């Protein structure tokens, strides 16, 4: 594999460490817990001329192997309707209000999960000293069925702490 992609994967795993996404643990009882696989997704970020400016690697959970009642319970997360966004923008324009758009880097990696979820070590980054261990998730991973809900709950709690009301 090319060094640029290895660096991109290492950067992704550094985000996991910074966000305390997981911890390496002994493999749990397979009758009580499912071990969800992981895989790498690769993408080139390009500038306006189509030139590659950055390689991006994202580690995702193979959420299609999750078992309801074991790996997840609640998955619903509300999404803003296009009409609501249009009304907000019209109101902002009419009242000459300055509106900012922001992006949260690795948003789902900030969402705390309630369930006990275990994932396999990432392909190519298995711990040689502990090959039989797995990661217990503290926060959501892209691909998990409950990831959007976990991020929504985290964002909602943050906004409430700043005085916003639902």
Please provide the spans of the model-predicted regions:
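Long, low-complexity, charge-biased intrinsically disordered regions
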Residues: 1-166
């Amino acid at each position: 594999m090319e060094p640029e992609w290895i660096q991109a994967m290492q950067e992704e795993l550094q985000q996991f460490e910074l966000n305390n996404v997981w911890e390496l643990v002994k493999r749990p009882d397979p009758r009580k817990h499912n071990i969800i696989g992981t895989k790498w997704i690769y993408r080139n970020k390009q500038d306006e001329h189509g030139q590659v400016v950055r390689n991006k690697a994202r580690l995702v959970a193979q959420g299609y192997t999750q078992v309801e009642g074991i790996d997840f319970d609640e998955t619903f997360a509300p999404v803003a309707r296009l009409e609501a966004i249009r009304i907000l923008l019209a109101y902002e324009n009419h009242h000459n209000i300055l509106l900012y758009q922001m992006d949260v880097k690795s948003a789902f990696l900030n969402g705390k999960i309630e369930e006990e979820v275990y994932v396999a070590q990432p392909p190519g980054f298995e711990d040689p000293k502990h090959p039989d261990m797995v990661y217990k998730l503290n926060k959501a991973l892209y691909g998990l069925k409950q990831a959007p809900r976990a991020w929504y709950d985290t964002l909602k709690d943050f906004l409430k702490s700043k005085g916003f009301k639902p």
